[in-house]
Amino acid sequence: MGQKVNPNGIRLGIIKSWSSTWYANTKEFSKNLISDFKVREFLKKSLSKAYVSKLIIERPAKSIRINIYTARPGIVIGRKGEDVDKLRKEISNITGVPAQISITEIKRPELDAKLVSENIASQLERRIMFRRAMKRAVQNAIRLGAKGIKVEVSGRLGGAEIARKEWYREGRVPLHTFRADIDYNTSEAHTTYGIIGVKVTIFKGEILGNSSPYINEKKYMPTKKGNKKIRKYTKE
């Protein structure tokens, strides 16, 4: 059987960049790597309701800079910047170096694979029918300009005794084209019947030259103070 490689990993260095962009010598590398992991786990718990898509970590001159991509920057910043100040202090305690935090707003969360997959997972946990959640995600993405999208859920769908897969796809999703801007992510829905896996793959178009897939985002630097025909497939 043919197997699919992770669409994000295979495009690293071609049209996608790494989520940690820093260099270190042999002695410091393991320390920085563990520090990055702790920071990501801390932010994942602290910002669980802020619709965070990704975290980019940089380490310039004995400090750490974190760019948070979120659909709700107000939740991250907090009232008068109080929450972001707390995050900055906690991250400084974890890493042992001064921390800077910048926030990038995601204008169209319907085109972000991580946010879409988490949204579908949360709907499944609230007992919303999986077909309705999948169709809504597909239609919203196409309506906002996606060239193609594929959504797959697998597990005990609808409480069935036998686990199975179902997926919907609309438009093109060219996984073999390296210049294709493919956004891929997964999430898990913890239901009373068990875990249901959610996979989302979104094709936003082809990147030529120095075009950026995040061209319409707005950055914040907080200070201290149609309904179309959809393909369906079922596999037991």
UniProtKB/Swiss-Prot annotation:
SUPFAM superfamilies cross-referenced by the UniProt entry: Prokaryotic type KH domain (KH-domain type II), Ribosomal protein S3 C-terminal domain
The KH type-2 domain, residue ranges: 39-107
The organism's place on the tree of life at top rank: Bacteria
Annotated keywords: Ribonucleoprotein, Ribosomal protein, RNA-binding, rRNA-binding
Transmembrane segments: none
InterPro entries reported in the protein's UniProt record: KH_dom (IPR004087), KH_dom-like_a/b (IPR015946), KH_dom_type_2 (IPR004044), KH_sf_prok-type (IPR009019), Ribosomal_S3_C_sf (IPR036419), Ribosomal_uS3_bac-typ (IPR005704), Ribosomal_uS3_C (IPR001351), Ribosomal_uS3_CS (IPR018280)
Annotated Gene Ontology cellular component terms: cytosolic small ribosomal subunit
GO BP term, example: translation
Pfam families assigned: KH_2, Ribosomal_S3_C
Keyword Ribonucleoprotein: yes
Subunit-level organization: Part of the 30S ribosomal subunit. Forms a tight complex with proteins S10 and S14.
Similarity comment: family membership: Belongs to the universal ribosomal protein uS3 family.
Function: Binds the lower part of the 30S subunit head. Binds mRNA in the 70S ribosome, positioning it for translation.
NCBIfam families recorded: rpsC_bact
Identification of the protein by name: Small ribosomal subunit protein uS3
Organism: Wigglesworthia glossinidia brevipalpis
Organism lineage string: Bacteria, Pseudomonadati, Pseudomonadota, Gammaproteobacteria, Enterobacterales
